[in-house]
Amino acid sequence: MLVSDLVATSERVAALSRRVEKIGALAALLRRFSPAEVQIGVDWLTGRLRQGRLGLGPSVFAEARRASPSVAQPALTLGDADAVFTEIARASGPGAGGERRAALAGLFARATDLERDFFARLLAGELRQERLEPVMVDAVARAARVPPASLRRAVMLAGDAAEVVKAALLEGALGLQRFSLQLLRPVQPMLAQSADDVVTALSELRAMALEWKLDGVRVQAHKAGDEVRVFSRGLGPVTKAVPEIVEIVRALPVRSVVLDGEALAFRPDGAPHPFQVTMRRFGRAHDAAALRAELPLRALFFDVLHLDGEDLLDRPGSERTAALRQVLDRSLRVPRIELPTAAEAEAFFADALAHGHEGVIAKSLAAPYEAGRRRGTWLKVKRARTLDLVVLAAEWGTGRRRGLLSNLHIGARDPAAGGFVLLGKTFKGMNDEVLAWQTQRLLELEIGRDADTVYVRPEIVVEVAFDGLQSSPRYPGGVALRSARVKRYRPDKPAGEISTMDEVRAIHAGALAGEAAEKGQAEGGGEELEDDG
């Protein structure tokens, strides 16, 4: 298949507003994939690369564009481009950077303008398809003529969506029957949608339980006899990084079990370390024994998917919790209350925050375990943190946001140096009316632009909600926002009164203060890490 065909469908799907139209367009494309193109195409359409991150940034894309003119007649195939991405991923050692740039330049020399734009967004992780994955499942189901529920279940159990999609497209419903829960193979995790507060969650779910929401690393632990394997939320193996969790699970008095939970590092005072600190245990290269002594982990589990030969996925949440209590001591389970009143729910939420955690998750007592975010099953409620920041630039949108300035570059005031410091980007929290207004207003403030971005005078103030801060060498202030979203514009506030970098650094330092106190004069410096969500 030509890349141009996939790009055209991607653009069309992003521009469509009706779900049924998106499904139809994707299904028509999926039927045209060859077996070798299934994984490539599905990954690209949902904004992923099977090769993982390739370490290429905007300057490399700009250099590749300048190196040669684009072509007018599309000829690149999915296999052609995928082979180049594999070449880039394999480049290593001295001169690897030059090899990657040369490979990308060669690809861009064979691509049209639209294909170049698509590749740049795909490689930068900025190919946003309005949460396309749930739509993709329904599109595959239509293309393969299989029930969507059967397909979703197979994807959850297999972990590898491409394998399931290929089976569905080539073998239909019969091909899906071979997928089942297998010990020592990860299952795609169940996720939570957001709710504004615990009272809202209580009214939506009614018969529910509340659990503390921990800011740790999601882990899935499998035991089959004496063998134990642990996987991350992304289904990658992390067994070697967490020997203490392996020991705990291996010692359980059961023959086989699959547990879902969180791994956290705690400070001596009992408060949890920030997510970034816990993530040091999961770095690419590390001495697990040394890190264990320096930063021990605890596992707190909240679900059980299999127990002694019996799969529990289809059991209601209340029954899975009962099974979990039979297997695990209270010290290994996430704190939980069931059927709370509104007052009890508020108190439980406050208690979670007081212990240094993110908030709570409300869970339906009747819900089975299903991968992804399912409406009416799990709802997360977190304490909202906000900063008043200024808009420094905005990127042109794609798909249904084409022609509108969408992705805002936002920054804080730096009184010491003068001016403003970029803290992050966000395209979240803006409806169509706000997008239209901000496009007009930002263009009035334009001071320059490049191919994708309009730079503006720093005058417009926005209130931004965020989940946390992380150290980041990619940003000039060394700190970046996590999960930023616009709450509202602040026309009442001048840019000279917005949040300062001192405030931002104080928030970040406060989160890391426990670690600094514990390590004293210890050597510092951590790598930039990302929340696994």
UniProtKB/Swiss-Prot annotation:
It catalyses: ATP + (deoxyribonucleotide)n-3'-hydroxyl + 5'-phospho-(deoxyribonucleotide)m = (deoxyribonucleotide)n+m + AMP + diphosphate. Gene3D superfamilies: DNA ligase, ATP-dependent, N-terminal domain (1.10.3260.10), DNA ligase/mRNA capping enzyme (3.30.470.30), Nucleic acid-binding proteins (2.40.50.140). Keywords: ATP-binding, Cell cycle, Cell division, DNA damage, DNA recombination, DNA repair, DNA replication, Ligase, Magnesium, Metal-binding, Nucleotide-binding. InterPro entries: ATP-dep_DNA_ligase, DNA_ligae_ATP-dep_bac/arc, DNA_ligase_ATP-dep, DNA_ligase_ATP-dep_C, DNA_ligase_ATP-dep_cent, DNA_ligase_ATP-dep_CS, DNA_ligase_ATP-dep_N, DNA_ligase_N_sf. It is an enzyme of class 6 (ligase). It holds the Pfam family DNA_ligase_A_N. Its cofactor is Mg(2+). DNA ligase that seals nicks in double-stranded DNA during DNA replication, DNA recombination and DNA repair. CDD domains: Adenylation_DNA_ligase_Arch_LigB. The active site is at K213. The lineage of its organism: Bacteria, Pseudomonadati, Myxococcota, Polyangia, Polyangiales. NCBIfam families: dnl1, PRK03180.1. GO terms for molecular function: ATP binding; DNA binding; DNA ligase (ATP) activity; metal ion binding. Residues 512-533 are annotated as: Disordered. ATP binds at E211, R218, R233, E262, F302, R374, K380. HAMAP family: DNA_ligase (MF_00407). GO terms for biological process: cell division; DNA biosynthetic process; DNA recombination; DNA repair; DNA replication. Its EC number is 6.5.1.1. This is Probable DNA ligase. Belongs to the ATP-dependent DNA ligase family.
